[in-house]
């Protein structure tokens, strides 16, 4: 907003009112309820996550620490990664190993997404957030690294302290921020990539979250031909499916119209590949 009005904050208040009035879209309510009951919007339990970890450790021949009593870094996953892109689990382990990190996954605090926030139910939001905070405090983590999810960044990085009631005793980094920092410090190195790429900014990470430069620094290290969209960075246009809209069937026509606008911007760059830091996007 050019006048500095926090529109997203007003939307959050409206969501809360809709939830209390029983007017939340039923699809979004069911996903949020499942997340509250099982710990994950896709029903990923701790046992299933552990199974996926064992599978990926064997598949990619990499050690993946789980439930270490003490660690400097707590890494989180999103349910969509665990369910649909489990190689992200192994990739995280490979990155942490290359960076020389003392890190772990925790079965009592692994899910980064927060549908309590999206549904407008602050009780569900706090419950999901406190699982992560409690797990991080338990192991004495200095840093919590968040995965691809945009709203997960907002929920913990910018609203987590409100849930705890005091400043968080650890640093919160989106995976793009972690990679950017690790590359700048020489903790990890990457091969140069001969491609042209453009980048879609997740709204909650870039414009609202403030981590706009991190992904671009990672892209710079890759040495690609980077083609910024006409509306990129803090001026990025939404993908059309954020804020839980992707779960709401009757919103599909609107979501597709917004997505068409976004894809027109992408195609104008004539880039070989589109990158993003949010699986939902």
Task: Enumerate the predicted regions with their spans.
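Iron-sulfur-cluster electron-transfer modules
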Residues: 1-147, 151-155, 159-160
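Short, structured coil segments at secondary-structure junctions
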Residues: 99, 166-168, 222
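General small-molecule cofactor/ligand-binding pocket signal
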Residues: 104-106, 171-173, 227-229
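Active-site glycine-rich loop that binds ribose-phosphate moieties when present
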Residues: 126-132, 178-185
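Short acidic, glycine/proline-enriched helix-loop-strand junctions
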Residues: 153-176
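Redox cofactor-anchoring modules in respiratory/redox and cofactor-processing assemblies
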Residues: 180-281
């Amino acid at each position: 907003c050019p006048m500095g009005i926090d529109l997203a904050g007003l939307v959050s208040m409206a969501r809360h009112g809709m939830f209390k009035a029983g007017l939340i879209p039923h699809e979004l309510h069911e996903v949020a309820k499942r997340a509250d009951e099982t710990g994950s919007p896709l029903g990923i339990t701790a046992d299933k996550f552990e199974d996926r970890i064992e599978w990926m450790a064997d598949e990619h021949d990499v050690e993946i620490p789980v439930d270490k009593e003490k660690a400097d870094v707590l890494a989180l996953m999103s349910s969509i990664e665990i369910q649909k892109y489990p190689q992200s689990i192994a990739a995280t382990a490979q990155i942490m190993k290359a960076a020389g990190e003392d890190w772990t996954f925790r079965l009592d605090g692994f899910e980064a997404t927060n549908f309590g926030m999206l549904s407008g139910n602050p009780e569900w939001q706090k419950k999901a957030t406190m699982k992560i905070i409690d797990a991080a405090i338990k192991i004495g983590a200095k840093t919590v690294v968040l995965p691809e999810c945009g709203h997960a960044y907002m929920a913990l990085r910018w609203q987590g302290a409100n849930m705890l009631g005091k400043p968080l005793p650890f640093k919160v980094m989106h995976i793009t921020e972690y990679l950017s920092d690790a590359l700048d410090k020489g903790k990890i190195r990457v091969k140069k990539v001969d491609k042209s790429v453009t980048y879609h900014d997740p709204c909650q990470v870039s414009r609202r979250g403030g981590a706009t430069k991190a992904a671009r620094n990672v892209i710079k290290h890759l040495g690609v031909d980077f083609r910024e969209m006409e509306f990129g960075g803090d001026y990025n246009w939404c993908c059309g499916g954020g804020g839980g809209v992707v779960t709401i069937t009757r919103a599909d026509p609107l979501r597709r119209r917004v997505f068409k606008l976004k894809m027109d911007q992408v195609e104008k760059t004539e880039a070989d590949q589109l990158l993003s830091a949010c699986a939902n996007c």
